[in-house]
């Protein structure tokens, strides 16, 4: 059986290069809950570490980004099993912790945990594929936050993740297949308009950045900014 193996692993990484960044930002005030911010940042670091290790492990087996190969190769199969298991264990632990944080504090927005802490919280929800109901709970919480407390692109990414998980067309084209082609998109002719409204770059630009970044990560390079 042939599969795009990197779709199993690489697409679990959520790129930080997809949003339009303003040329300059005012200095953000300190987080109200610095210990919680640091906890979320540590979770973010571990989330990305295990995924980058998975990409690099496949790269060492000669599996390139977007390449189709056979699961009959025992070495590749072992890498897929080990890395997917590691990610699942970490993602579930992070999901349970984020759920407890939400119950205690509500959604951790920028005021509570800073912009980077809020980004980390979103990423944990984005990767909680084992529990779609939890992802929907997170999306509802994020959408209910006051303006400026969350990034609009986080809503776009999580909306698409949930829709694709339900085998429905996505709205913003954030979720790719193993060859970095978007999963089916609702009203695809207007996708760039919807992306712009959420602070996302055009789909074609995102596709190229995604593929380039994953290839660099697989080689052990740092993605270009």
PLM region spans:
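Positively charged n-region of N-terminal signal peptides that target proteins for export
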Residues: 1-4
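A cross-kingdom marker for long, charged
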Residues: 190-225
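Boundary at the C-terminal end of the N-terminal hydrophobic targeting segment
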Residues: 17-19
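Short, charged low-complexity intrinsically disordered segments located at boundaries
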Residues: 127-134, 170-175, 223-225
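N-terminal helix-rich structural modules
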Residues: 22-166
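A periodicity- and composition-biased signal for non-globular, repetitive helical segments
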Residues: 8, 57, 200-201
């Amino acid at each position: 059986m042939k599969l795009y193996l990197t779709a199993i692993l690489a697409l679990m990484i959520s790129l930080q290069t997809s949003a339009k960044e303003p040329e300059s930002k005012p200095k953000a005030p300190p987080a109200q809950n610095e210990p919680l911010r640091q906890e979320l940042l540590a979770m973010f670091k571990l989330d990305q570490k295990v995924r980058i290790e998975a990409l690099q492990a496949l790269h060492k087996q000669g599996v390139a980004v977007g390449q189709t190969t056979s699961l009959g190769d025992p070495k590749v199969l072992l890498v897929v099993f080990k890395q997917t298991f590691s990610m699942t264990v970490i993602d579930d632990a992070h999901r349970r912790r984020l759920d407890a944080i939400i119950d205690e504090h509500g959604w951790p927005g920028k005021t509570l945990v800073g912009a980077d802490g809020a980004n980390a919280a979103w990423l944990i929800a984005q990767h909680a594929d084992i529990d779609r109901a939890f992802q929907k709970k997170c999306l509802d919480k994020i959408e209910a936050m006051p303006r400026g407390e969350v990034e609009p692109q986080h809503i776009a990414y999580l909306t698409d993740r949930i829709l694709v998980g339900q085998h429905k067309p996505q709205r913003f084209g954030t979720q790719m297949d193993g060859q970095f082609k978007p999963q089916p998109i609702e009203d695809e002719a207007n996708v760039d308009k919807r992306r712009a409204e959420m602070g996302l770059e055009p789909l074609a630009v995102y596709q190229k950045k995604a593929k380039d970044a994953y290839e660099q990560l697989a080689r052990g390079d740092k993605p270009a900014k």
